[in-house]
C-alpha cells in the first residue's frame, strides 16, 4: 500500500512538472525587462565600460520560447544572455513561467572622429510569439589622450595640457619643469594616479570652462549613486619645491579638484623668507578621503574658493603667509544625515575643518589671515589654531562666520560664532541618494553668514566665485546669496 502511494505521488509530481514545461505560443504573452533602456555614461574609446545587467522576466504562467535575440548594429555593444555571448547561438531559448534570465551588456567603442562626446545607440530585439520587444542601448563615446607607462612613472620636463580632448592618467606623472593647463581641460585620474609638479604651474580656467581633476569612473556605484560622489578615487595633485631650486609660482583659477585622497598639496623644503607663491581662486576642492588643501612653507593667496567635505582637515596650514578672503570651508564629510556611506575611510570627530600649526620648529614663520570666510562643519570645533601662546600667533580673523569657541581678541574681531540653533547656514548639508539631494554650500535665505562681511576687503574682490556682484554689506563665503530658483 505504502509503495503504491509513493508511485502515485511520483506520477502526480511528473504531471505537474509536465504542465510547467508547456511552452505557449500565445502572442499575448510577452517578456518583461527590468530596464527597457540601458545608458552608459561616458565610455572612453578602446577601454570599454563596466558591465550592466538587465533581468529578462517571464511573468506568465506558462513557459515561452524566445525565437531569436538580435543586436541591430552590434558595433559598440556586446551581450551575454544566460551565459551565452555568441549572438548566433541566441535562438530558441525557453523561459519557464515566472522565471527569468540574466542579460549582461558591455560597451566597447573604437576611436571616434569627434573629440567631443558622441551619443551612440543600438537596439536589442527579442522575437517572441510573433512579437518583437526591444531594449534600447545608449552610450556616450569619448576620445581621450592616455598617459601611462609600463614602469608606473611618466616624467616630463615641461608639459602643456590642452582642451582638445580629455586626458586619462594611469600612473605617477612628474613634471620637472613647467606645467600649463588650458581652460576647459578635463583630467581623468585612474585609481592610484597622482601628479608631481616641481616647477611653475599655470592652470587658468574660466567660469564656463573650468579645469577639472576627477576620477575616471563615470558609471554608477549604485543605482542612484554616481561613482563621482565616492571619495578616494585617485591620489592627488602635489606641487613640490626643493631647496636647490628657485621658488616656484603657482596660479590656479577656476580649477575643480574632486573626489581624490588629497586634493591639493603644496610643499616647500625652504624655511626662509623666500618661499614659493600660490594664488588659488574661484576654485572648488571637494570630497577627499584625507585632506583638501595643504600649504606648508608656502605664501598663499586664496579667495572665492569652496573647500569642502574632507575626512581630515579641509585646510592645513604650517609655515608661510596665508591670506584667505571670501572662502567657504565646510566639513560635512559623512554627515549623520547622509543616508549612504560612499566614503573610503574613518572620520575622526576631533579633526577640525581648518588647522593652523604654529608649533613646528622646522617650518617658516606662520602668518595667516581669514577675512569674510565661512569655517564650519559637523564638528563643534571647526577651527583650531595650535600655538604656544595666543600672543605668539601672528594672524587675523575678521568678518567671518566661525563654528568654534571665541578666538582670542588679539587676532580676532567682528566675527559671528555659530550657535547650536544655526541649522540653515547652507541650502543643503547632507546627501540623500534616493531623493537626489546633494551637498549645496550656497547660502540659505536665513543664513547667519549673510551680510556680515567686511566691505573694505570686498573692494578687491567685487564678484563671487560664479561672477555675481557682491553687495555693499557682503556675505561671508565664496557665494553671494541669491534666491533659489
Spans of model-derived segments:
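Beta-strand/loop edge motif enriched in small/polar residues
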Residues: 21-24, 31-42, 47-49, 53, ...
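C-terminal motif of bacterial Sec signal peptides marking the signal peptidase cleavage site
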Residues: 14-17
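Short, solvent-exposed loop/linker segments at beta-strand-coil boundaries, enriched for Pro/Gly
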Residues: 70-89
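Sec-dependent signal peptide recognition
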Residues: 2-9
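Asparagine-centered strand-capping/turn motif at beta-strand->loop junctions
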Residues: 56-60
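Short acidic/proline- and small/hydrophobic-mixed sequence motifs that coincide with surface turns
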Residues: 49-50, 61-66
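Conserved, structured regulatory domains from eukaryotic proteins
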Residues: 475-477
Amino acid at each position: 500500500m505504502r509503495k503504491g502511494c509513493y508511485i502515485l505521488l511520483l506520477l502526480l509530481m511528473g504531471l505537474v512538472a509536465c504542465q510547467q514545461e508547456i511552452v505557449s505560443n500565445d502572442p499575448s504573452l510577452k517578456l518583461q525587462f527590468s530596464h527597457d533602456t540601458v545608458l552608459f555614461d561616458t565610455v572612453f574609446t578602446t577601454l570599454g565600460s563596466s558591465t550592466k545587467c538587465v533581468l529578462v522576466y517571464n511573468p506568465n504562467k506558462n513557459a515561452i520560447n524566445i525565437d531569436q535575440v538580435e543586436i541591430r548594429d552590434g558595433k559598440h555593444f556586446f551581450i551575454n544572455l544566460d551565459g551565452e555571448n555568441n549572438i548566433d547561438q541566441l535562438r530558441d531559448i525557453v523561459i519557464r513561467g515566472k522565471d527569468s534570465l540574466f542579460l549582461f551588456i558591455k560597451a566597447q567603442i573604437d576611436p571616434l572622429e569627434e573629440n567631443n562626446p558622441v551619443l551612440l545607440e543600438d537596439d536589442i530585439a527579442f522575437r517572441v510569439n510573433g512579437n518583437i520587444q526591444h531594449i534600447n542601448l545608449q552610450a556616450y563615446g569619448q576620445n581621450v589622450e592616455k598617459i601611462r607607462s609600463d614602469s608606473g612613472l611618466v616624467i616630463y620636463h615641461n608639459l602643456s595640457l590642452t582642451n582638445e580632448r580629455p586626458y586619462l592618467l594611469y600612473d605617477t606623472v612628474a613634471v620637472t619643469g613647467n606645467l600649463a593647463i588650458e581652460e576647459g581641460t578635463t583630467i581623468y585620474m585612474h585609481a592610484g594616479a597622482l601628479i608631481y609638479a616641481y616647477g611653475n604651474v599655470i592652470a587658468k580656467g574660466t567660469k564656463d570652462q573650468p579645469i577639472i581633476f576627477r576620477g575616471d569612473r563615470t558609471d554608477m556605484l549604485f543605482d542612484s549613486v554616481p561613482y563621482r560622489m565616492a571619495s578616494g578615487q585617485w591620489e592627488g595633485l602635489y606641487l613640490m619645491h626643493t631647496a636647490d631650486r628657485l621658488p616656484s609660482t603657482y596660479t590656479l583659477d577656476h580649477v575643480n579638484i574632486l573626489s581624490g585622497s588629497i586634493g591639493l598639496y603644496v610643499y616647500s623644503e625652504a624655511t626662509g623668507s623666500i618661499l614659493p607663491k600660490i594664488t588659488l581662486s574661484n576654485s572648488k576642492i571637494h570630497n577627499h578621503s584625507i585632506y583638501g588643501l595643504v600649504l606648508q612653507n608656502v605664501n598663499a593667496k586664496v579667495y572665492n574658493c569652496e573647500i569642502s567635505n574632507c575626512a581630515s582637515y579641509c585646510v592645513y596650514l604650517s609655515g608661510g603667509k596665508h591670506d584667505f578672503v571670501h572662502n567657504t570651508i565646510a566639513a560635512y564629510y559623512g554627515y549623520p544625515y547622509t543616508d549612504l556611506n560612499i566614503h573610503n575611510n574613518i572620520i575622526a570627530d576631533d579633526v577640525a575643518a581648518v588647522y593652523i600649526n604654529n608649533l613646528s620648529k622646522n617650518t617658516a614663520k606662520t602668518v595667516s589671515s581669514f577675512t569674510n570666510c565661512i569655517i564650519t562643519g559637523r564638528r563643534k570645533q571647526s577651527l583650531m589654531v595650535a600655538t604656544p601662546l595666543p600672543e605668539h600667533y601672528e594672524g587675523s580673523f575678521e568678518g567671518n562666520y566661525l563654528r568654534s569657541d571665541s578666538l582670542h581678541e588679539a587676532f580676532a574681531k567682528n566675527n559671528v560664532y555659530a550657535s547650536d540653533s544655526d541649522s540653515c547656514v547652507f541650502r543643503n548639508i547632507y546627501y540623500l541618494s534616493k531623493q537626489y539631494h546633494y551637498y549645496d554650500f550656497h547660502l540659505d535665505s536665513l543664513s547667519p553668514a549673510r551680510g556680515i562681511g567686511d566691505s573694505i576687503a570686498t573692494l578687491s574682490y567685487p564678484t563671487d566665485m560664479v561672477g555675481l556682484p557682491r553687495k555693499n554689506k557682503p556675505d561671508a563665503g565664496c557665494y553671494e546669496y541669491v534666491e533659489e530658483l
